[in-house]
Amino acid sequence: MGLPLLHTAMTAAEFLAWDEHQTLRREFVRGEVFAMAGGEDRNNTVAGNLYATLRQHLSGSPCRVYMSDVKLRVEVADCYFYPDVMVTCSTADAASRLIKRDAVLVVEVLSPSTSAYDRGDKFADYRALPSLAEYLLVDVDKRRCDLYRKGVDGLWVLHPTQGEQPLVLASVGLTLAAGALWADLEPEPPDAAAAVA
């Protein structure tokens, strides 16, 4: 996972009671509590761009978008996560102030310390959510997105985008221009081959 283990052998109920009094965010994974890695400003900018676009797009609908301060409960996997961005369209989630359970879209903006975990074990845990239709991994360094979409057969299919390709989020009916996702970032570094020429 790449994050320091803080506590072991804690139940989900104990975690919630303990976490209520903490100032920093921590994730709970099957009895273990892990500190969240701090994010770079570029990651925060991209998460904010996505949040703002989704918020505007979903305005007036039953769906709500949340950023990294809202917990997502994955009951079957016995986990609590703080996704960078998530969307839920559930009336039960709308009634719950602190914890969401029915995300249709989960987004993680990758960092070097969490990339392997976000692509592996965390994705496996998220897939246990019956409501989840899409899982988006955003690589700011490569300006690439790996969108995993669940098919009608229950299998997850990768839909990668890179550069100026639009990002199609079918779960919320949004096609996002690449410029909107990467807005306010420094210009993309020139290609290594072009730099030599």
Tell me the role of every PLM-derived stretch.
Residues 1-197:
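Gly/Pro/Ser/Thr-rich low-complexity, intrinsically disordered segments predominantly at protein N-termini
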